[in-house]
Amino acid sequence: MGRITQHLQVPRVVSTETKVFVNTRPDTIAVEEPLEIRVNGTNLTTTMRTPGHDIELVHGLLLAEGLIRDASEVSTARYCAGAVGPDNQNTYNVLELDVVPANPRRELNLVSVQRNLPTSSACGVCGTTSIEQLMDKKGWPIEPITPDPRMIITLPEKLRERQKMFDKTGGVHAAGLATLDGELLVVREDVGRHNAADKVIGHMLMNGRLPLRDTILVMSSRASFELVQKAAMAGIPGVIAVGAATSLAVDTARDAGMFLAGFVRGNKFNHYAGELG
């Protein structure tokens, strides 16, 4: 597995009104590398991610795309033995999966997903070409929650306390899954916020925990449509974010009966959808 951080010596520039100072100092940056995802021999997509928890990421991505519903549908997940770098070592940047739908009548629509998945660490709307497609994905049923505001305001700080890679680099997002009692069950960090969410959801999927009723997806980023949709596909009834919520995220949360809050900072937040306890 590749490194998740890289150490550099970089010029540090300080500019004042009268003089510019330049000093060399050590810096730690987050690693971003491609992960090529192959499903049943088909090159589905290449996503830019922070190495680590790759199999969780892919499970979460396949769930979000509607290609799987249960971890048992992924019969094999392995790194490609032929993916080697200039040093003749395995780069662990090509992941091959064998997927067999639990329902034999359900076909894997790899072509439409493959055609539209972009190559990015902020992958955005994955595998879709229209608003109708965005809204048509069917995940686990949502059972609404009524979270306590006093619990909600504690979650960003709890998430921040577990952002070890951010402490070192300042360059990654974090996602966490919390119970309604405010316990963080799992936290993942990545250069892409969507990757972080996929890793969290993929972890729970691989441990047989779906649907994720009575939980909240906690994000260190803004609350975009894609994150709300990923949560909905996993049956997560609530999303909170330290940043803003987008219009489509709000509309989607309201239509799905989900709870959504943004700008959760200090003792305040904006309440966009759902009911409070």
Curated annotation (Swiss-Prot):
GO-annotated cellular components: cytoplasm
Binding site for Mo-bis(molybdopterin guanine dinucleotide): F263, V264, R265, G266, N267, K268
GO-annotated biological processes: Mo-molybdopterin cofactor biosynthetic process
Active-site residues per Swiss-Prot or TrEMBL entry: C123
Organism: Corynebacterium efficiens (strain DSM 44549 / YS-314 / AJ 12310 / JCM 11189 / NBRC 100395)
Subcellular location: Cytoplasm
Keywords for this protein: Cytoplasm, Molybdenum cofactor biosynthesis
Family of the protein in this entry: Belongs to the FdhD family.
GO molecular function annotations of the record: sulfur carrier activity; sulfurtransferase activity
Protein name: Sulfur carrier protein FdhD
Location (main, coarse): cytoplasm
Purpose: Required for formate dehydrogenase (FDH) activity. Acts as a sulfur carrier protein that transfers sulfur from IscS to the molybdenum cofactor prior to its insertion into FDH.
InterPro entries reported for this sequence: Cytidine_deaminase-like (IPR016193), FdhD (IPR003786)
